[in-house]
């Protein structure tokens, strides 16, 4: 008895590797609906394989540390919010669980919102430890954004419930005695830093969304404090509020 196309699709969607797909008894079924289902499944499996390969690549720096220090407790650190005109800079320090496997981890700006939220939820529930650090707009104005970012990162480290032995940091160095590796574009090269990037991004976006409830005119829930047209027009119309960075242009020139 010939299987219906719907039944064949169910079988195809249960296949977990391209090799298995190519050897499947339905592979030679010439019906258009079956061939379309095979093509879709192949594409999905190829995407999943690419994510797995990227994930392995992004464990390189962690594995290099573990080769020399098998018991190392590695902490990834990243920040978000260096460029906006309003709101804090937020850092996250994350110690991944030993059996971590968060396919899709990447620079948070490259990860679709739905996937970012999914990863954030999994990370919060499963990692060994994480903590956030914040430097306020006032501190950014007082110290400059680079120093404020360092402050936020150190606060995140200090907030961890587990003491790390090694730090992987996105494009920064810290005045910290722990061994540290600074990686340019680290959020796309290290799973630990990418995890911190995702968590920091979601935390700050939530913060700015809450802030928008008190200051709806600026559109913080959409622009996260960046200088969009709506944001700049609101500054022209009603001025600035306490979370605006007075050392950043064009705000600085308006004072």
From Swiss-Prot:
Residues 72-255 form the RNase H type-2 domain. Endonuclease that specifically degrades the RNA of RNA-DNA hybrids. Keywords: Cytoplasm, Endonuclease, Hydrolase, Manganese, Metal-binding, Nuclease. This is Ribonuclease HII. Transmembrane segments: none annotated. Belongs to the RNase HII family. Its cofactor is Mn(2+); Mg(2+). Pfam families: RNase_HII (PF01351). It catalyses: Endonucleolytic cleavage to 5'-phosphomonoester. It is found in: Cytoplasm. One of its GO terms (biological process) is mismatch repair.
